[in-house]
Regions:
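RecB-family 4Fe-4S metal-dependent nuclease core
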Residues: 1-249
Length: 249
């Protein structure tokens, strides 16, 4: 079955395939959904809060109002777990509000989408925050709500920021600036200047993987099972407690 957005590439597709080709098949070809768990639910709540805040207010005093309005109650195993994560998110938002008082950038858009075409492929991305800095350059920001940073994290190798940089240049004509991953729970920002991104290499990498997405071979990557939200239902899962019966959500 060929999905409707065949020949379209985005970072989520690429990241999913690199994590596990079989997971890509489940999500993007068969249309199965992962569902929410506590960590991902809080991530959705934080992202939505910051989008609503920067779109409608930019007054730090209003951030908690937006958080309470945007907090998502789904994905928690109990009321106690929901409260635990609500309080975690509240602390993240309170700390973010303190930092907001000193921000000097101009927010140009949140969840801002770019689309461009190259060699028969359509590239698409959605940027959490796009802003103009006091020096006139531009700043692309992707929020992460992780509580820790992976030991092998290297911002210079981020395929996500690389595509966002290329998209910012090609779709919007903004050539001066930087792209960043902002770990909001940890108040850490990792950036790469636009000029450090080799556009040709980035597009070549995406198209190389894109060719594989059009194939029929999607082998499982069992070393990823422990981190996969499908691990209890996937027929290839090596998770010891997975369900025997695999079914659609």
């Amino acid at each position: 079955m060929i999905p409707n957005n065949y020949h379209e590439l985005n970072y989520s597709k690429i990241a999913t395939y690199l994590f596990c080709p079989f997971l890509y098949k489940l999500k993007y070809i068969e249309g199965r959904r992962e569902g929410l768990v506590a960590v991902t639910s809080l991530g959705v709540s934080i992202h939505k809060t910051l989008e609503e805040y920067h779109t409608n207010s930019n007054d730090p005093e209003s951030l908690l109002v937006y958080y309470n309005r945007c907090f998502l109650g789904a994905g928690y195993s109990s009321a106690a777990e929901q409260m635990e994560y609500y309080l975690k998110g509240k602390r993240i938002i309170e700390d973010y509000a303190k930092r907001e008082k000193y921000r000097q950038s101009e927010i140009l858009g949140c969840e801002k989408e770019f689309i461009f075409e190259h060699n028969g492929w359509k590239f698409r991305g959605k940027i959490d925050r796009f802003e103009k800095l006091p020096d006139g350059s531009y700043h692309v920001i992707d929020y992460k709500t992780d509580a820790r940073i992976s030991d092998n994290f290297d911002v210079t190798k981020s395929l996500q920021l690389a595509l966002y940089t290329v998209g910012t240049k090609r779709a919007w004509g903004k050539t001066q600036g930087k792209a960043s991953i902002y770990f909001v729970a940890l108040n850490k920002i990792f950036s790469i200047p636009f000029e450090d991104v080799n556009e040709d290499l980035v597009l070549e990498k995406y198209m190389e993987i894109g060719e594989k997405l059009e194939g029929t071979d999607f082998p499982p990557c069992t070393k990823s099972c422990i981190q996969c939200l499908f691990r209890m239902r996937c027929p290839h899962s090596i998770h010891p407690e997975r369900h025997i019966k695999f079914h659609k959500l």
